[in-house]
Regions:
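Ligand-binding loop in jelly-roll beta-barrel domains
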Residues: 75, 83-106
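A short glycine-rich, His/Asp/Glu-containing loop-to-beta-strand
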Residues: 9-36, 43-46, 100
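Histidine-centered active-site/metal-ligand motif
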Residues: 38-40, 88
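Short beta-strand segments in beta-sandwich/barrel cores
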Residues: 34-36, 52-57, 79
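Basic/polar N-terminal segments that are highly enriched at the extreme N-terminus
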Residues: 1-11, 107
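Short acidic-glycine-tyrosine-enriched beta hairpin
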Residues: 61-84
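Glycine- and acidic-residue-biased ligand/ion/polar-headgroup-sensing regions
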Residues: 41-63
Length: 107
């Protein structure tokens, strides 16, 4: 499949809230489960709710900070500010369910 033929999904499992300032999403992945391939078109804040280990699998044309495969131990309460540009799949490589809240910042 070429990049032009690629179908991108939502950045997380479920959209919780949207207004003129933010979009708030929930990501929920069982152990071994992958998210859809998705593109981050806005800067966002990621807050870990549950889980122990996650991987980010970038697409070849991913931009931004996370443009290489990454694995990370995570803990509930951790948060990260991430700039837009990433095109990736999230993969739960842990032993526990992984849940996060992603807050996309509109300008």
């Amino acid at each position: 499949m070429t990049q032009a033929e690629r179908v991108l999904g939502d950045i997380a499992t479920r959209l919780l809230v949207e207004n003129d300032r933010v979009k708030i999403w929930e990501m929920d992945l069982a152990p071994g489960e992958d998210s859809d391939v998705h593109e981050h078109t806005m800067d966002y804040i990621l807050v870990v709710i549950e889980g122990d280990r996650i991987a980010g699998v970038p697409e070849p044309d991913s931009k931004g900070l996370y443009n290489e495969y990454i694995e990370a131990d995570v803990q509930p309460g951790q948060y990260f500010y991430i700039e837009k540009g990433g095109i990736e799949t999230a993969r739960n490589i842990g032993k526990r369910r992984y849940r996060e809240i992603a807050i996309e910042l509109k300008d």
